[in-house]
UniProtKB/Swiss-Prot annotation:
GO terms for molecular function: rRNA binding; structural constituent of ribosome; tRNA binding. This is Large ribosomal subunit protein uL16. Binds 23S rRNA and is also seen to make contacts with the A and possibly P site tRNAs. GO terms for cellular component: cytosolic large ribosomal subunit. Part of the 50S ribosomal subunit. It comes from the Bacteria. Keywords: Ribonucleoprotein, Ribosomal protein, RNA-binding, rRNA-binding, tRNA-binding. GO terms for biological process: translation.
Amino acid sequence: MLVPKRVKHRREFRGKMRGYAKGGDTVSFGEYGLQATTSHWITNRQIEAARIAMTRYMKRNGQVWIKIFPHKSYTAKAIGVRMGSGKGAPEGWVAPVKRGVVMFELGGVDEATAREALRLASHKLPVKTKFVKRGEA
């Protein structure tokens, strides 16, 4: 599971998710990629589930690059607690993904295998995605 080794502040503001990605919008490591077409928070569990779905389908052939990292903490109050009395305890970690970001990349496999592996991974994610090739995105 992806989590930061250490952070300066345990609790963060939620922030805004407006506009397109400023960087990370091209396929740079592999030959094929999975690009987000909507913006959303992606948890470390969702990233891991997508990674497992891809590697199981590819049967350990090829290579997978994960280009997003869950560096932002999110908080939640316990069930049944009344409003007020401070911010809740840190609950987990998320990667804020804007539209246009290439989240996963694959290499060393043919296009049909890559397309199916990334399709399976996309079902584990809360964003709409599209398949991109190197040089296109």
